[in-house]
Amino acid sequence: MKFEHRPVLLEPTVDALLQADFGGRGASRARPRDEAAALTRQATGIFVDGTFGRGGHSRELLGRLGPQARLVVFDKDPEAIAVAQALAAEDARVTVVHGGFATMTEELAARGIERIDGVMLDLGVSSPQIDDADRGFSFMREGPLDMRMDTSRGPTVADWLAQASVEEMREVIADYGEERFAFQVAKAIAARRATRPLHTTLELAECVASAVRTREKGQHPATRTFQALRIYINRELEELARALASAIELLVPGGRLAVISFHSLEDRMVKQCIAAAARPAAAHPRLPLRESELPQPILQTLGKVVADDAEVAGNARSRSAILRAAERTSQPLPATGAEDFVPAVPGAAEKGRRR
């Protein structure tokens, strides 16, 4: 079955990678514009799409890159990889990696790539993944309780729920879903599985709905729990943390980072990482330095962009999307690399994955 996918914030994302004068709300005011460098990147640069999906952002970017440029695309989803390989067969500039963006540094190094000119990450679940009941992402469609981005490996949500303790479930649902009824939901799941296992999305959605006492306007009671389980089973925040550090380390001076997030946990991590890297390192208070010798930031923020009314009207899933962008400066990285700029992954991940 063919599912339609509309890329979110399509043009602003590619603009963030290529336009010398790009700037969203909150962009650094003193940022110089290097038109020549931007044109060189566009003609011969190496770019990464860390979340190929169905290729909307990649195709838009390729349409604006020169014939000598390269684009390396990543995705965990075997169905997305099939689409990417078809694109690569048509366009020699495209290299396909079946894997998550957390492996960016290693996969690029294996292909002889040490630095890149731009990287974009679209952190949302794609429309085809949501609309395909067999993937198990939707609480509105009957399907197996799976939720894995890469269906070829790892436990499903059903596997994990069958053996997790009430406390483990509570932690995951509270930390990754920010669900205030997390304990009640965890107890309801444990009670249900004591009589019969949870195998389908609608079974879980009904179980969660029975435990969530009040409903948020316009939101299904299972929304937060499904989000939490998807994030946990796919290690989404841990992988995002690795990808952000890798991107900062890989970008050439003037290279760009563009990240689209869809919920507060992702956006908070991206925002805090960019903000930390955009703060200059502290100079020793008694060390005499000229102004030109003062520590400079690693990144300059290019601000944020949200979908306008026209896009939201045509694609409701764009309503919660936030694009944040930043540009790498020429300031050398600290000896510890970029990991110090990335905030700690909240909650359950810090306690370790016991199961």
Swiss-Prot record:
Signal peptide per UniProt: none
EC number: 2.1.1.199
GO cellular component, as recorded: cytoplasm
Record keywords, A-Z: Cytoplasm, Methyltransferase, rRNA processing, S-adenosyl-L-methionine, Transferase
Highest taxon above the source species: Bacteria
Enzyme's top EC category: transferase
InterPro entries per the UniProt record, alphabetical: RsmH, SAM-dep_MeTrfase_MraW_recog, SAM-dependent_MTases_sf
Function per UniProt: Specifically methylates the N4 position of cytidine in position 1402 (C1402) of 16S rRNA.
HAMAP family to which the protein is assigned, alphabetical: 16SrRNA_methyltr_H
Family note: Belongs to the methyltransferase superfamily. RsmH family.
Protein name in the entry: Ribosomal RNA small subunit methyltransferase H
Organism the protein comes from: Bordetella avium (strain 197N)
